Amino acid sequence: MKKLSTNQIRKIWLDFFISKNHYFLEPVSLIPVDDPSLLWINSGVATLKPYFDGRKTPPSPRLTNSQKAIRTNDIENVGVTARHHTMFEMLGNFSIGDYFKKEAIELAWELLTDKNYFDIDKNKLYITVFNEDIEAYNIWKDVIKIDEDHIFRLSKKTNFWDVGQGPCGPNTEIFYDRGEIWDPNKIGPRLISDDIENDRYIEVWNIVFSQFNNDGNNNYVELPRKNIDTGAGLERFASIFQNTPTNFETDIFYPTIKKVEQLTNNQFKYSIDNYFNPNKKQTRINTAFKVIADHIRATVFAISDGVFPGNKDRGYIIRRLIRRSCVFGNELGIKQAFLYKLVDSVIESMKEFYPYLVDKKSLVEQTIKDEEEKFLKTLSKGYDLLENIIKTKNTVSDKDALLLFESYGFPIEQTIEISELSNVTVDIEGFKKLLEQTKQATRNARKDLKAWDKQNELFTKLKVESEFTGWSEISRDNAKVIYMFTDQKQVESITDQEVFVILDKTPFYAEKGGQAADSGIIFNDQMKGFVIDVQQGPMHQNIHRIKVQDTLKLNDLINCRVDEEKRIYTMKNHSGTHMIHYALREVLGSSVMQSGSYNDENGLRMDFTYHRLPTNQELLKAQNLVLEKIKNKVDRQTYFCSLEESVKKHQALAFFTEKYDEIVRVIKFGDFSSELCGGTHVNNTSEIEDFIITGIESKGSGLYRIKCLTSFKTVNEYLNEQFKIYKDQAEIIIDKYNQNKDLLKNDQLENIYLEIKNITINKDNLILIKDLLDKLRDLNKDYDKKVNDLITANKLLKYKDLTPSLNKDNVNEIKLETTDLNIRDLKQLADDLRNKYNDLIVILLSSTNENNFIVVAVSQSLQNKYKAIDIFNNLEGYETKGGGNANLAQGKFVKK
């Protein structure tokens, strides 16, 4: 058998299927698009869901890819097993309504065994099929000519892909026999038939025959269109072709492991021989190396795709991977930040297929280093906590173990090892139960549904073609109604109801690419209809949701009128989105990545990834850059070309994992903005008119949402509204000030108020009025304190002559009952009296209209015998409620 590098394996796979008329799908981001059911892209087929469920038409019915994916549901197994990873790469070939079982099996067999491709010995391949799938069994036996003792007919548990509802079907798996050396107990093929975990028979390919639909009650019906979904793990293939004990000795991970050895100053070494001659200590060392090599690869890709360490969702996963790696690095004697030094090793091994990693190197290194340095402080606290637990308890409880695991990043194995050194046990079973409860809560919250929606037969059969003409027009006469339906039922006529309509040609823009749908009217001599919404169908048809007045019929000719004002303002905002995207990348750097946007007639927002919140100065600089481009009156240019040409010739940016057609549309403004975009735009930047950033907010770790407005009208309305809000807030402050002005005057406060009152409304002054209002608030806060102090001092004047008397214990005591002091006044009076007299107990009670307040204070010299809180709790004749300490206690009272 050939010895192949990972890059060679991937290339042979893709070249083979491309030669078999499969369309190559570029790998997409690990962040799912428009799929809230997934936290990560977790399989090769996850990115193809819209094609399989009929929402979108694929570029070809035959597809192939090599897709990176992440799964972290059992992260604790990484480094322990031979083939478990957080991030992995899935090789796939897919048929959507094209070939089915026979050709899928034939293609797999040819790629695996033909000497021009993988050239694997046929006698080393074993097959499993679903025991009721006679067709697949016969194809393997009669067409491929596999020996019957190499085919296993297994149960639904192992060979039927079904997630409870939606498309499903039997699957066939292909295993490679690595030989008896990997089967120490000489069990043989029963390892396959009994589904026993082993390192001899490695599953290399899984082919799912998606031919049924499960209605959710285990009632199965044939799908109108049958599909093929296959997956083969690249890491497993690499282990086979490079003949390594586990995936970690392949060219994917081993260079990183060798780099980690260097970072330990070669005090710790990874041992390949440990697989055959296991040693407990060396196994633990190997595990540390494997965890680090696995986790750093996943982390590099995740950050490059726009996920930054954080406290929830994807960000928390990456934070946990970094922390887990730090803990294992600590076991290898690495006490300082080191993971960021491995980034180069990962990129070097992966850059051939993922060249974009090179540009992300600095960002990834800095992000990881910052996170490591923060965690190393936490890790030290974790060790201190565990040491304290060991000193004070005989057992590390399940809750303590979980706290160390989740909050301090301690693997349970490390907690056990450290505890065992002091003969302290760990409640392992309790920990496992708590951990599973935590995982289940997460699963319930996210409901990571793998099932796809039941195929919409109406949509999958919807083959009518429609042309969008709205890039160049906002009205069209004599558009023809070519399809109508309601509630998934096709209709030929509708009266005074809502209906979905497809026209042969339409100027109405369908919501997509972050741009809101057009609205407007359709009409002819017999009817009128209001276009409420427009969405895109599976073959890019614009599907209009229309409220019909009178009667609309199939084949009617109608006139279309797009709401012109809405379209114009939406265009300004969409072009404004491109402008601010350019400006942020110019100011902050190319590591800024757009991850989504939305623009309609009211404004625009854009989500982008960056490792920190931009400063106000940076945002102002970006805003001014946009205004400069508007002032320069730059023409828009539009190009239609291939995806490759759009990037190479036009330097077009294509972010947030959108899937593109073979021919794409490029929107360019000068030489500074070039993006793939299907939306509507202004012809010249001057048509945007005006621009202002209205806010920015965090949407999670490393993800920010910026909000902006365009046009003279919208910006002026916003400025008038904001200035009114700020001036009204200043009025509230000055009105309160005027009530106390006779008691205490503040010229600075009055002058700043006048500045706010008389400020001119414009963009430049927006930041100024915010700053002035902040100053006014600060001055007012200080002013309020001084006024309150004056008021309190005036109220306390009548108590200046209070003198102590001896209580029953012969101790100086002042006890006062009054009706005009609040709790703040009582505390101030207590402090004044203690400062005036030595060795004093103060008991002050005030009954106001609303509350009965009490304060007890004791001089420090008496606190060894008398404590304020004790006197407070045991005051004769009163029931008290509150709190305090030896020095002072406060609260409320009721007379008994």
From Swiss-Prot:
PROSITE patterns: AA_TRNA_LIGASE_II_ALA. Its EC number is 6.1.1.7. Zn(2+) binds at residues 574, 578, 677, 681. The keyword Manganese does not apply. It is found in: Cytoplasm. CDD domains: AlaRS_core. Keywords: Aminoacyl-tRNA synthetase, ATP-binding, Cytoplasm, Ligase, Metal-binding, Nucleotide-binding, Protein biosynthesis, RNA-binding, tRNA-binding, Zinc. One of its GO terms (molecular function) is aminoacyl-tRNA deacylase activity. One of its GO terms (biological process) is alanyl-tRNA aminoacylation. One of its GO terms (cellular component) is cytosol. The keyword Zinc applies. Its cofactor is Zn(2+). It is an enzyme of class 6 (ligase). It catalyses: tRNA(Ala) + L-alanine + ATP = L-alanyl-tRNA(Ala) + AMP + diphosphate. Binds 1 zinc ion per subunit. It comes from the Bacteria. Belongs to the class-II aminoacyl-tRNA synthetase family. Catalyzes the attachment of alanine to tRNA(Ala) in a two-step reaction: alanine is first activated by ATP to form Ala-AMP and then transferred to the acceptor end of tRNA(Ala). Also edits incorrectly charged Ser-tRNA(Ala) and Gly-tRNA(Ala) via its editing domain. Consists of three domains; the N-terminal catalytic domain, the editing domain and the C-terminal C-Ala domain. The editing domain removes incorrectly charged amino acids, while the C-Ala domain, along with tRNA(Ala), serves as a bridge to cooperatively bring together the editing and aminoacylation centers thus stimulating deacylation of misacylated tRNAs. NCBIfam families: alaS (TIGR00344). This is Alanine--tRNA ligase. It comes from Mycoplasma capricolum subsp. capricolum (strain California kid / ATCC 27343 / NCTC 10154). The gene is alaS.
